């Protein structure tokens, strides 16, 4: 039986970089990893409202200085008036990590929302939760193919589509999405839509271009 490889993990070190960049000895590794998970869980709760697409966590050698780089399509919501939103984020994060941690938060605006798989998946989720037909929601997501930075897109929705008793998956692809080509710059995201018929899964693959190293 065929197994599918995660498009981002498959390309780590080639076209993708690690979302957590730090080193730790065996004694402290699990503690720092758990802290990262708590931070991501908290920020992912804000992802839909603030259009957060990616979270990068960097630490120093001791692990007590944390740098959060948050990529978002709506930076104004996170930053707030005069940076009040950043202070609130830091205060809330410090509630579930040790007091000796120093946090620096950088909010990075996504340059092109039409070339970001996470934000496109959020758009599909929003439409599904607003009871838009799933085929129409997928078709609207495919409009991003008109952007010059996107050469191909694939969108898949799975679950009790249109309230059917039996769950199934349907997908549509436009352009090229070469998942087996390591040099292909693939962006991938998975989301969940809570509908009256249950939870629907949404997956989006974006093929931007091929990265040729000299």
Swiss-Prot record:
GO cellular component terms, A-Z: chloroplast; cytosolic small ribosomal subunit
Pfam families given in the database record: KH_2, Ribosomal_S3_C
GO molecular function: rRNA binding; structural constituent of ribosome
Keywords for the protein's UniProt record, in alphabetical order: Chloroplast, Plastid, Ribonucleoprotein, Ribosomal protein, RNA-binding, rRNA-binding
Disulfide linkage: none
rRNA-binding recorded as keyword: yes
Stretches assigned to the KH type-2 domain: 39-111
GO biological process: translation
Superkingdom field: Eukaryota
InterPro entries: KH_dom-like_a/b, KH_dom_type_2, KH_sf_prok-type, Ribosomal_S3_C_sf, Ribosomal_uS3_bac-typ, Ribosomal_uS3_C, Ribosomal_uS3_CS
Subcellular location: Plastid, Chloroplast
Family in the record: Belongs to the universal ribosomal protein uS3 family.
Matching NCBIfam families: rpsC_bact
Quaternary structure (record): Part of the 30S ribosomal subunit.
PANTHER family associated with the record: 30S/40S RIBOSOMAL PROTEIN S3, SMALL RIBOSOMAL SUBUNIT PROTEIN US3C
Protein name: Small ribosomal subunit protein uS3c
Native source organism of the sequence: Thalassiosira pseudonana (Marine diatom)
